[in-house]
A protein has these predicted regions:
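Short glycine/acidic-enriched loop and turn motifs that connect beta-strands
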Residues: 88-93, 154-156, 199-201, 246-247, ...
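Blade-level signature of beta-propeller repeat domains, shared across WD40, Kelch, NHL, RCC1
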Residues: 363-423
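A short beta-strand motif characteristic of beta-propeller blades
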Residues: 57-66, 108-129, 167-173, 211-220, ...
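C-terminal low-complexity, Ser/Thr- and acidic/Pro-rich disordered "stalk" regions positioned immediately N-terminal
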Residues: 400-475
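Beta-rich, blade/repeat-based domains predominating
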Residues: 68-80, 118-142, 175-187, 219-238, ...
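Beta-strand-rich domains and repeat architectures in extracellular enzymes and scaffolds
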Residues: 63-97
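Short loop/turn segments that connect beta-strands within beta-propeller blades
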Residues: 103-107, 162-166, 206-210, 253-257, ...
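A cross-kingdom C-terminal cell-surface attachment/processing module
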Residues: 479-501
Length: 504
């Protein structure tokens, strides 16, 4: 492990390092009140159960709503009980984008804002990009100050909105954070941290003054370390990120700016998602190229490396990875959620990494986020499952409490995945009990969400890697998963072995 230090004095943002706030014109976001607009938002979108999830004790239950096209990330506000969702459709010029506010419990529409057009947008040849907006991608809520921070990836910058009205507070200058991706808020220190997917920097902003401070540097350059997702433990001031360009993670002390690199297994390719567990010091990493979830200790010791789906193929029938993209830690229920873009699934893991349930997430699941109270939110970027709308799903998942087992499904029905005890010694998804966050109170196995259909999983051959943030229109995806579950029939002296079949 190597240590790269940035002095505390540097973090204090001297005149030589700080980026001055300039009076450059800041376009005002349009808060939309018209009955319809170009955002494509369905204000009355129906809320339905996620296919295959069941409201049974010990299982993951989910609801979803096709809110708008081009969904990218979510962020939860505890004080408002609102969910903020970003939307950006297509490739440059991105003319359709919005910041959407939903009720966090019901997913009902509350409000949305449409970013203004960027009048200076140009393509690689210097030609004007007419209609290009300050499209929003990454998102985080500062509840202390009542603001929402977003990344404008196409313009390499960030913006700040009012959390209640969604009016623009500040649009930062363009080209200050190369390919700005994730943003997290450190309310205790009045800081916002923004990852730069095309550099080896973490941009730092003062949230009390809305000014940019000195960057945090990780690695030698973008080829050595390109920061993707961010995971912050505010209590200890620990910021964790992962590199898409190398098999590394990094643990950053935000007080000093020092970054300690953590080596990952050599097979890890195009890592993008990261979640940090401060209680154990473990880091959870989702990697698109290798299609796996890797669990490592702070020193790089590998706890587990789990392929999240097999049998995934592109439209030409070629084998591809699951496209494990983002990861979230549910610290309330001791579970880890991973979005698998190519497989069209969300896999639920225990804290050791073993798969406990596979959920049909729709096509191209993109982001997953924990709200701190036992719920996990996700979005996809592939429209509806049946193709009836281009609007993507916002989904909310939670573990159903209770100890009563659900009825074993008919073996001829759609495949389901069972839970096992996250505290168990074996990293085997065929174990027979689940602990809902307490090792002393296991609950009997129940049957959770059905895996999406298809013995072979089709994804479009021209799918765009998420790091490019271009979106795509991929063919319907799914996964082929076999799970054996030893059921509660053991109590009757017999063992019921259920073989989950491949099905469409």
């Amino acid at each position: 492990m190597s240590v790269l230090a940035l002095s505390t004095a540097g973090m204090a943002a001297s005149a030589a390092h700080a980026v001055e706030e300039t009076p450059a014109p800041a376009p005002a976001a349009t808060v939309v009140d018209a009955a319809s607009d170009s955002s494509g938002i369905d204000r009355n979108a129906a809320v339905t159960a996620v296919p295959g999830t069941v409201n049974e004790p010990g299982s993951i239950s989910g609801i979803e709503s096709s809110v708008a096209p081009g969904l990218y990330q979510t962020a939860y506000s505890p004080s408002r009980n609102s969910l903020y969702v970003t939307s950006a459709v297509g490739r440059p010029p991105v003319s359709q984008s919005s910041l959407i506010k939903l009720d966090a419990d019901t997913l009902a529409y509350q409000n949305h804002a449409v970013p203004e057009i960027d009048p200076t947008a140009i393509d690689r040849e210097g030609k004007p990009l007419e209609g290009a907006r300050y499209a929003v991608y990454g998102v985080a809520v500062d509840d202390e100050r009542g603001t929402v921070w977003v990344t404008n990836t196409r313009q390499n910058t960030v913006a700040v909105y009012d959390a209640d009205t969604l009016k623009l507070i500040k649009q930062f200058d363009k080209d200050i954070v190369p390919h700005s991706r994730d943003v997290v808020i450190d309310a205790a220190r009045d800081r916002a941290y923004v990852s730069s997917a095309r550099s080896n920097k973490i941009a730092v902003f003062d949230t009390s003054t809305n000014t940019q401070l000195a960057d945090i540097t990780v690695g030698q350059d973008a080829d050595d370390f390109s920061a993707m997702s961010l995971s912050l433990d505010e209590a200890s001031g620990t910021l964790v990120t992962v590199s898409a360009s190398s098999a590394k993670a990094a643990i950053i002390d935000v007080a000093s700016g020092s970054a300690t690199e953590v080596p990952l297994p050599a097979g890890v390719a195009r890592a993008s998602g990261v979640a940090y567990n401060p209680a154990t010091g473990r880091i959870y990493i989702a990697s698109q190229g290798s299609g796996d979830l890797v669990v490592v200790e702070k020193d790089g010791t590998v706890v587990n490396q789990v392929v999240t789906a097999t049998g995934v193929k592109d439209a030409e029938g070629k084998d591809i990875s699951s496209g494990a993209l983002n990861v979230a830690l549910d610290s309330v229920n001791s579970l880890v959620y991973v979005t698998n873009r190519n497989a069209g699934t969300i896999t639920v893991h225990d804290l050791d990494g073993a798969v406990r349930q596979t959920i049909d997430a729709g096509r191209n699941p993109n982001h997953v986020e924990f709200d701190g109270r036992g719920n996990v939110y996700a979005v996809n970027k592939g429209g509806s499952r049946d193709g009836s709308t281009k609007n993507d799903y916002v989904q909310r998942f939670s573990l159903v409490a209770g100890a009563s087992p659900g009825a074993a499904p008919d073996s001829s029905s759609a495949p389901t995945s069972g839970f096992t005890d996250p505290g168990g010694a074996a990293a085997d998804p065929t174990s027979s009990s689940l602990s809902n966050g307490s090792s002393s109170a296991p609950v009997a196995v129940t049957f959770g969400a059905a895996a999406p259909g298809g013995a072979t999983v089709a994804a479009a051959a021209n799918s765009v890697p998420e790091v490019d943030q271009r979106g795509s229109s991929l063919a319907r995806t799914g996964t082929s998963i076999g799970v054996g579950v030893v059921a509660a029939g053991l109590l009757l002296g017999g063992a019921l072995l259920m073989r989950v079949r491949h099905c469409a």
